[in-house]
Structure formats: structure tokens, C-alpha cells
Amino acid sequence: MNKLISIIIPCHNCSATIVDCWNSIKEQTIGLRSLEIILVDDASDDQNVTWNALSKIEASAPDSVIIIHLDENVRQGGARNAAFPYIHGKYFMFVDADDTIEPDSCEKLYYTAEAADADMVLFNCTYRDHNGNSIPRVIYKEHQTLDLSNDTIRRQTLLGNGLTYGCWDKLYRTEFYRSVGSFFPEHVIYEEPLFVYPLFFYATRIEILPEYLYNYYIHANSTVTEYALQHRGDHPAVQFLLLSWLKKHTDIFSKYYEEITFYIVWSAFIETLVFTKNDPESDTAYPFYEYIRSILIAEFPDYSKNHYIRSLGYAEIFAYLEQPIETQEALKNLRSLIKKANL
């Protein structure tokens, strides 16, 4: 039977959660026979506990499950990359090994994509914890069709207006993805924009489905936050990798230079400041932010003329791109502006 949707699941030491994840997939109303599940063991180091769990899943549904073992830990981005050659479904999606999807997720996504001939379908998720608490993440409030042959609409998607650039809240048409050929960076924890953002330059039709089809589990483990802060450099680094990819595609870089300038400057500089506002080293890390600033000024010397940036009204914040951030006091002042703006 031809597979309708391939589901890619990166796995690392996930024996405690993969069963719930698998149960949510095998109970899909579209039928397990219509699905292809690609489980990628990202060099788990738990004495084969994860590998054995994945092997049991494969043995229970050999016609629908593929397991792949990686000898080197490349983190989620690299594990997803490893799955791409194995995709046979007309569409594919990502699920993390500690998350679940709603029983009718695949059915709704498949028929929505088919009816609209969509390159991507975007949908909502629910944040959950293991105490039974849940909070819906409201991004999409109504069903919409984005016709990206309309260049004005495309430019809005490149600014992130009302969209996300995460990878697991989307369904992708496989043929479309392969025509673009974007990929995830390896060995980083903030990997998704390098894969997702390029797709918006080439998609012709995107469906927005305002339903909560994905359950994202929040873990009350402070080490997760600590680890993210230890790897604070991943956030701007991935944006600079994305910039390098975009510059090689001169057609889109030239045509959408204004949108790209806004996105990279905002994401690499402002978002990094926001994401690290609880960093215990926040007041002494000014060389890190000066490094980001110096790259942005070199790449976008005319950023201050960008009409998207000018229209935001954060002139005091963006003014810090014009001067070196060389003291602890300068960074403190910049952070106070970020807090004042409620960013």
C-alpha cells in the first residue's frame, strides 16, 4: 500500500516517552497502514534501552516502521536529516519522541492538503505537562488558504506575521520539499529555521488549519533551560547559516532583500537577547552580543533604512547596532530597553 504520510521521529535516550508517542501514532484514524514511521536512534547511550524499545515497535508493525541507528550523536536536526532519504509518503511531518499527536491528526492533515493541493499545512498545538495541565498555543484562529503566487502574501510570510518557523507544527508535501532541498544544521539545539524558512520562498499554496493536532510536553527539568543557556550561541549561529544559504540563492536574496534583512536582524539580535534574558551571565556576556552586532552590521550596513525595522518603533533598541557593545553597562542598558518594550 502506498504511504500517505511519513512521520519522522528523532530518538535519543527516549525509552520513557517513546511508547506514548508511538501509541498516539498507531491509533491514528487514517489507519497505520497508510503511515510510514521513521525512528532515528541518535546514538543513544543508555545501554541499548532505547534501541530495544524501537526494535519492539518495528517488530509490531514491520510494514509501517523503519528504524535507523546513528553512530554519532548529531542532535535532532541531524537525526531528521538522516531520515529524509527513507521517506516514501506523499507527505511527511515531524514528531518529537516525548510528544504525541491527536488521533485524527494525520487524517485531517492529509485531506486538507489534498483538497487544496497544498505544499504545506500549518496547525496549532497544545502545551501539556505530565500533571495533566494544558495550555493551547493559539497561533491560527481560522482556516485560511495562503496563495503565495501573490507576492504581497509571500512577503508577509517571510516576516513571520502570524506564522511560526518551527518544524513540528506543519505537514510537508514530499515532492515540494525535495525541489527546495533545505536541511537542518547538526549538533545544535535551535535547528529549525534553516530547514523551514527557505520553504516559504518556494511554496505556492499553504493551508492554515486552526486545530490543535500536536501535543507538546513541557518538562519541569531545570537542566533543559540550563543546557539551552549553555548553548546560547546556537540561536544566532543558525540564523547566520541561514543567511549563508540565502546568499547562495541570489535570485531570492536580491528579490526579498528587505524581508531577509528584517528577519535576520530581528532573529539574530533581538530574539537572542529575549531568549537569554534569564541568563545568569547576562550582564557579563557583552562580547557575545558584540560579536553578533559586528556580523549584522557587516552583512546589512544599510539595515537602518529597512522600512520594516523603521516601522516597528524600537529605535532605541536598534540604535545599539550602531555602536560597539563593549561594556557591561552597555549590555545592561540594552537589556533594560528590551524589558521596557515587553519583548
Task: Label each residue range with its predicted role.
Residues 3-6, 24, 36, 194:
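Cell-envelope/extracellular polymer assembly enzymes that use nucleotide-activated donors
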Residues 5-17, 21, 28, 40-42:
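A conserved hydrophobic helix/loop-capping motif in glycosyltransferases and polysaccharide synthases
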Residues 22-69:
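Acidic donor-binding segment of Leloir-type glycosyltransferases
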Residues 69-87:
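Glycine-rich, basic loop-to-helix element that forms the pyrophosphate-binding segment
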Residues 92:
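Short aromatic/hydrophobic "clamp" motif used to bind/position activated sugar donors
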Residues 97-207, 217-230:
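Donor-binding/catalytic cores of nucleotide-activated saccharide
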Residues 117-118, 277-343:
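Membrane-interface aromatic/basic loop that binds lipid-linked glycans or pyrophosphate carriers
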Residues 211-220, 226-253, 271-300:
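Catalytic core of nucleotide-sugar-dependent glycosyltransferases
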